[in-house]
Amino acid sequence: KGAHIFRAREIPRKGNTGKTIFLNYVSWPLYAAGALNRLPGGYDAVFCFNTSPVLMCWPAIKYAKKHKIPFTNYVLDLWPENLYSVLPVKNSFMRWVAQTVSDSLYKRADRLIAMSVPLQKRLIARTGKPEKDVAVISQYCEDFYAVPCHDPELEARFSGRFNLVFTGTFTPAQSLNMVLRAVLDARAAGAENLHLLLVGDGMSRESLQALAEELHAGDVVTFYGSVPAEKVPSFTTLADA
């Protein structure tokens, strides 16, 4: 009954520098591959919920091949494109390596799952797999996120403004620095009540806060921090956009 969880080590990406991000990305797959002998076995298939890095599917490939069982890879972050949103890789050889490794790992899955039809087409083009081997299963959010939730205290705090609300993880992929600059431009053009409310956390939070301070945007943006999932509707209900 239930799920048995086996954890593997990883090198934390302290400071989110290029070096620590790289070490974080490569460490978990290596540690996980070395820990496969801890698994009791008897499995019918291997399923990978493949976010970042793409290398996280390598232990799954290794286990499936050893035990001759099918491997399905649910692709949520497309690599190496997602990598480039975090690390500005300019070297053409390194980009070729990232592309080649990513395509090779995707090809080694017996079946791929994409989040959307455009991603499905992209994976088919890159792997040469037939359409029947690349399914589409869209992501969704739990029903409670769609139910408005009024919080009088929050509504009083953020009333009288046009609230642009973002909830989630702050990473370079979200380009929230661009959003902040756009809000400032809009306010300068006359949208004086426009306010950016950022709920969450992530590797870009410190740089975003530094940018807000540099641009004197203290009254333009609020960094609320992380909240429990069930609290999120209280913030999205505040959103005018």
Specify the residue positions occupied by each region the protein language model found.
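Acidic donor-binding loop of glycosyltransferase active sites
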Residues: 110, 236-241
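A conserved catalytic-core segment of Leloir-type glycosyltransferases
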Residues: 1-31, 36-40
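Membrane-proximal helix-turn-helix segments that form the acceptor-binding/catalytic region
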Residues: 55, 62-67, 92-114
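An aromatic- and histidine-rich active-site surface loop
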Residues: 22-32, 45-76, 80-82
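Conserved donor-binding/catalytic core segment of Leloir-type glycosyltransferases
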Residues: 155-174, 179-184, 197
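Nucleotide-activated donor-binding/catalytic signature segment of Leloir-type glycosyltransferases, i.e.
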Residues: 206-233
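Acidic anion/phosphate-binding donor-loop and adjacent secondary structure
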Residues: 124-125, 132, 140-156, 175
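Carbohydrate-associated surface elements
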Residues: 118, 137-140, 226
